[in-house]
Amino acid sequence: MIGMGKIRARREGERGFTLVELMVVMAVIMLLLTVAIPAYLQSVKRAKEAVLKEDLHTMRTAIDQYTVDKEKAPQGLDDLVQAGYLKVIPMDPMTSRSDTWMTSESDTLMDINETQGGIDDVHSGAQNLATDGTSYNTW
């Protein structure tokens, strides 16, 4: 039992890592993950917000164009698809669903030639806060 407390040197031909080496590598990996994961999640959120802004712009433009062309506002987002102004109702990137869009209807006519009221704006159905502190459903 003379050599039990001593760390023995590696002999030629022995392979592997010591427990200390493995612990150091794991600590470095954990440190990198604590920095990388929040940055990744933030960039995913910003990307979803960019998609939301683009989808809202596209749908609002389609609503306006439909209103001018048909001389009446669409009664729902499905009208925009049926008339060919949108291929499909886009999926809300914040709710991951296409049926959560909130439309606002107006009895006020948007165009001088318009004969019937209908939807005049669309918003996300998400209740969460954006990176700028505003609620998605106010965009």
Residue ranges, per PLM feature:
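N-terminal leader/signal peptides at the extreme start of proteins
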Residues: M1-R15
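A generic structural signal for short
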Residues: R8, F17, V51-L52, D64-Y66
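N-terminal single-pass transmembrane signal-anchor helix
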Residues: G13-Y40
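Regular, well-ordered alpha-helical segments
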Residues: T34, Q42, E49, T61, ...
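Aliphatic-rich helix starts adjacent to a transmembrane/signal segment
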Residues: A39-L56
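Low-complexity, acidic interaction segments enriched in glycine
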Residues: H57-W139
